[in-house]
Amino acid sequence: MVAATAEFRRVFSAFDRDADGKISAAELRLCMKAALGEDMSAEEAEALVSSADTDDDGLLDEEEFTKLAVQLEMGDEEERCRGLMEAFRMYEMEGEGRITPASLKRMLSKLGSHQGIEECQTMICRFDLDGDGVISFEEFKIMMDA
């Protein structure tokens, strides 16, 4: 978290264009466009600032900005996990919470890639960290990050 806090501090300084120790909705809009290429309406920027503005001054200080950034980052991670879970469920069989060589073979066949059980076992072995012959959701997440 220390590294993340240092990163948020660096981002805060970059967003604080006039170096007044506060980020306005206008500064937030400009920097979102420059940093991420995302267009943000004035209303969206105001709403985002307002959601994290604990002292009601219409601006974000470094602490408010950091809390907002952490919340947004957590939201992105939750969304990513939901997407991964949807993908995982496509490959698992019978709702057992694991991908077996047979369930992998079945899904790959549906996708037009016809692999034998042996090839599917080999694919699973690469990410089967606990050696149980199947891929758990945790192992699936690691595999998708590789």
Swiss-Prot record:
Q: Which UniProt keywords apply?
A: Calcium, Metal-binding, Repeat
Q: Name one GO cellular component term.
A: cytoplasm
Q: What are the binding positions for Ca(2+) 3 in this chain?
A: 128, 130, 132, 139
Give GO terms: molecular function aspect only.
Answer: calcium ion binding; enzyme regulator activity
In its keyword annotation, does this UniProt entry include Calcium? yes
**Which positions bind Ca(2+) 2?**
53, 55, 57, 64
**Domain EF-hand residues, every copy:** 3-38, 40-75, 79-114, 115-146
The record ties this protein, via SUPFAM superfamilies, to: EF-hand
Disulphide-bridged cysteine pairs: none
Annotated positions binding Ca(2+) 1:
16, 18, 20, 22, 27
The protein's role, per its UniProt record? Potential calcium sensor.
Q: Which PANTHER family match?
A: EF-HAND CALCIUM-BINDING DOMAIN CONTAINING PROTEIN (PTHR10891)
- What is the name of the protein in this document? Putative calcium-binding protein CML19
